[in-house]
Amino acid sequence: SQXPQSETDYSQLSGEWNTIYGAASNIXK
């Protein structure tokens, strides 16, 4: 999102992606 909280939104998105990527890595294995 745009605005003063963009860094917070990016951090939250990054955390969500880490969770998704971790799950995908497990499936993948």
Curated annotation (Swiss-Prot):
Coiled-coil spans in chain: none
Protein name as catalogued: Dander allergen Equ c 2.0101
Keywords (A to Z) from UniProt: Allergen, Secreted, Transport
Cellular localization per UniProt: Secreted
Family, per entry: Belongs to the calycin superfamily. Lipocalin family.
Domain of life: Eukaryota
Native species: Equus caballus
A cellular-component GO term for this protein: extracellular region
Predominant location: secreted
